[in-house]
């Protein structure tokens, strides 16, 4: 059970201890079982922001097709996690859609790959694709990683209800991909936006608006 007072750590080789997270200002956090070495890596992100996100009926040319996962628990808190490469940046799970893959299949696959979670059901789907541009430095970095020069991402967002227990969450994922996250927490919609990297804030505001009736 996630605690919102002292910070509860979970580590496979040591007993639970109580502490506070430096990268998550004034917010308690629940750690996964990710080894300690993964929680110490640091990097910086540019403060430059992309243009504001926009909503479209279909993905535009030049944008990578992607699904976003807004995972909500029984207390209507939303799952967010800190990136290993940018520990100060917290985000909801997301990932690319494979060629010919249904977005509803992709969203469940990405959730399991990144968090180990399989106990979830789709409650709602955002009516439009939400697009955003990469800042120039991020675009260059991703061009090397992906081998394609995408302008940004076109995302289809889904609201999922978490039906399992917190112990199911494992940031090592299902073992099919390299871990992306270091810590995780259940947070309010406002905190989701507040703690996101700058160029994703407009996207997250639109996602919270799209699912507002379910999050109240």
From Swiss-Prot:
Domain of life: Eukaryota
Localization: Plastid, Chloroplast
Chain span(s) of sequence motif Nudix box: 95-116
Segment annotated as transit peptide: 1-53
Example GO BP: nucleoside phosphate metabolic process
Tissue specificity statement from the Swiss-Prot or TrEMBL entry: Expressed in roots, leaves, stems and inflorescences.
SUPFAM superfamilies the UniProt entry points to: Nudix (SSF55811)
Disruption phenotype: No visible phenotype under normal growth conditions.
GO molecular function, one term: guanosine-3',5'-bis(diphosphate) 3'-diphosphatase activity
Enzyme class (EC, first level): hydrolase
Pfam families, alphabetized: NUDIX
Enzyme Commission (EC) number: 3.6.1.-
Domain Nudix hydrolase: 62-209
Gene Ontology CC: one annotated term: chloroplast
Disulfide-bonded cysteines: none
Keyword set, alphabetical order: Chloroplast, Hydrolase, Magnesium, Manganese, Metal-binding, Plastid, Transit peptide
Cofactor(s) the protein requires to work: Mg(2+); Mn(2+)
Chain residues that bind Mn(2+): 110, 114
HAMAP family according to UniProt: Nudix_RppH
Biological function: Mediates the hydrolysis of some nucleoside diphosphate derivatives. Can use diadenosine 5',5'''-P(1)P(5) pentaphosphate (Ap(5)A), diadenosine 5',5'''-P(1)P(4) tetraphosphate (Ap(4)A) and diadenosine 5',5'''-P(1)P(3) triphosphate (Ap(3)A) as substrates.
Family of this protein: Belongs to the Nudix hydrolase family.
Listed name of the protein: Nudix hydrolase 26, chloroplastic
Origin species: Arabidopsis thaliana
């Amino acid at each position: 059970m996630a605690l919102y007072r002292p910070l509860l750590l979970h580590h496979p080789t040591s007993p639970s201890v109580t502490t506070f997270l430096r990268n998550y200002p004034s917010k308690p956090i629940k750690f996964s079982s990710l080894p300690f070495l993964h929680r110490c890596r640091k990097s910086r992100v540019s403060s430059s922001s992309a243009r504001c996100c926009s909503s479209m009926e279909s993905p535009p040319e030049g944008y990578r097709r992607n699904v976003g996962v807004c995972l909500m628990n029984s207390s209507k808190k939303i799952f967010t996690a800190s990136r290993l490469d940018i520990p100060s940046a917290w985000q909801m799970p997301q990932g690319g859609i494979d060629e010919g893959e249904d977005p509803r299949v992709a969203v469940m696959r990405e959730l399991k790959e990144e968090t180990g979670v399989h106990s979830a059901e789709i409650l709602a789907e955002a009516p439009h694709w939400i697009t955003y541009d990469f800042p120039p430095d991020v675009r260059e970095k991703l061009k090397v990683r992906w081998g394609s020069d995408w302008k940004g991402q076109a995302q289809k967002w889904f609201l999922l209800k978490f039906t399992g227990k917190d112990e199911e969450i494992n940031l090592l994922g299902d073992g099919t991909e390299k871990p992306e996250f270091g810590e995780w927490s259940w947070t309010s919609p406002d905190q989701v936006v507040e703690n996101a990297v700058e160029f994703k804030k407009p996207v997250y505001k639109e996602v919270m608006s799209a699912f507002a009736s379910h999050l109240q």
